[in-house]
From Swiss-Prot:
Source organism per UniProt: Listeria monocytogenes serotype 4b (strain F2365)
Broad EC category: transferase
Name of the protein in question: UDP-N-acetylglucosamine 1-carboxyvinyltransferase 1
2-(S-cysteinyl)pyruvic acid O-phosphothioketal: residues bearing it: 117
Transmembrane segments: none
Binding site for phosphoenolpyruvate: 22-23
Compartments reported by the entry: Cytoplasm
Pathway: Cell wall biogenesis; peptidoglycan biosynthesis
Pfam families: EPSP_synthase
Length: 430
């Protein structure tokens, strides 16, 4: 079993380049199934386990897929099958985004109920409601969602919650529907805009991505195209916090300020210096951090995917701060692990009360989900002694070479095989 070992106390300095966004690339890869002509070429694709998983799903569906360096090519011009089995979908709940493209392209979709990080229930009913509004017949049997439609017809769909996945799935299904589809109360994340841009490059007619209402005029067919994935705003935010908590000076290359304006506002409120430069965002950590309260919200609010990382900087701040989670239930599983490192935290309903500044102590901790994995490593950067983080399968779903990038900025961090190290002499690693 691999683990990451961090020796705290090093200031981070230098520059780090962001990769393509995980949350953007997965639906874009799924959308390549809509193209009945040509070969799609996707650039700036991150080397993540989730990308390999969705590529395997597409291969199973009979698409021709290759992934070399940071480029994915997909040819889906052959006869596409419509059955995405449990063995793939269980690894990653985002696999459900193939459902909209399959329904639009083949008239049917059979997709296993999804897996991924165990963060609350995250139901798929909003996706299915949209498909049904467009004329699909949907049923759930034996752990599979089955949807069929002789033809999809444009409809008006109101989302009870601005779900990112539902917005993407319904938007993709609507591209080949007959007539006009209007989706209200949609997600407004940058990844939605990136997907809409890709669809439009293929010949779709999607208007309003990034606003609360998206309108899609259905077309008869879509043609493959070339597209570069936007930079990962969550990876950028994670490294911004790493720089801030270590009192460092780091340029986050390719970070887009407009994509993380809520995080920038909160960090500046805490005393962190943020400078927008031509090729990214520079972060300069202060001597002391001020406590602030944070509430996660759908975009453009504070992103839930930055919640656990933000809690690290909150627990290092002077005074009491509150983190309130409004997007997902059961997303505080990492709190117990942080307490093992001497964090003063108390869960009260949908909030965590954090008292600081904590004097963090290195400990052996287990990642509970993707972002918690990164947060525990961040905590290790400022803890006294050695922090050992296990369950790296979560980290690899959303961060490529995370330890290597931290090393390049000056951190003492190593990724090791547990069976090949002497845990009584961790100093020998550095």
């Amino acid at each position: 079993m691999e683990k990451i070992i961090v020796r705290g106390g090093k200031q981070l300095n230098g520059s780090v380049k962001m990769e393509g966004a995980k949350n953007a690339v997965l639906p874009v890869i799924a959308a390549t199934l809509l193209a009945s002509k040509g070969t799609s070429v996707l650039k700036n694709v991150p080397n993540l386990s989730d990308v390999f998983t969705i590529n395997e799903v597409l291969k199973y569906l009979n698409a021709d897929v290759s992934f070399v360096n940071d480029e994915v090519t997909v040819n889906a011009t052959g006869e596409i099958t419509s059955d995405a089995p449990f063995e793939y979908v269980r690894k990653m709940r985002a696999s459900i985004v193939v459902m909209g493209p399959l329904l639009a392209r083949t008239g049917s979709a059979r997709v296993a109920l999804p897996g991924g990080c165990a963060i609350g229930s995250r139901p798929v009913d909003l996706h299915l409601k949209g498909f049904e509004a467009m004329g699909a017949i949907v049923k759930i049997e034996n752990g599979y969602i089955e949807a069929t439609a002789e033809k999809l017809v444009g409809a008006k769909v109101y989302l009870d919650f601005p779900s990112v996945g539902a917005t993407q799935n319904i938007m993709m299904a609507a591209t080949l529907a007959e007539g006009t589809t209007v989706i209200e109360n949609v997600a407004r994340e940058p990844e939605i805009v990136d997907l809409a841009n890709f669809l439009n490059q293929m010949g779709a007619r999607v208007i309003g991505a990034g606003t609360e209402v998206i309108r899609i005029e259905g077309v008869k067919e879509l043609t493959a195209t070339e597209h570069s994935i936007i930079p990962d705003r969550i990876e950028a935010g994670t490294f911004m916090i790493a720089a801030a908590i270590t009192g460092g000076n780091v340029l986050i290359e390719d970070a887009v300020p407009e994509h993380i304006s809520s995080l920038i506002a909160k960090l500046e409120e805490m005393g962190v210096q943020i400078i927008e430069e031509e090729n990214g965002i520079r972060v300069i950590g202060p001597d002391k951090l001020k406590a602030v309260d944070v509430k996660t919200m759908p975009h453009p609010g504070f992103p839930t995917d930055m919640q656990s990382q933000m809690m690290v900087i909150q627990m290092l701040s002077e005074g009491t701060s509150i983190m309130t989670e409004t997007v997902f239930e059961n997303r505080f599983m990492h709190v117990e692990e942080m307490r093992r490192m001497n964090a003063d935290m108390k869960i009260e309903g949908h909030s965590v009360i954090i008292s600081g500044p904590a004097k963090l102590q290195g400990a052996e901790v287990a990642a509970t989900d993707l972002r918690a994995a990164a947060a525990l490593i961040l905590a290790g950067l400022v803890a006294d002694g050695y922090t050992q983080v296990t369950e790296l399968k979560y980290l690899d779903r959303g961060y490529n070479n995370f330890h290597g990038k931290l090393q390049a900025l000056g951190a003492d961090v190593e990724r090791v095989d547990d069976s090949k190290i002497d845990v009584t002499n961790l100093a020998s690693l550095f």
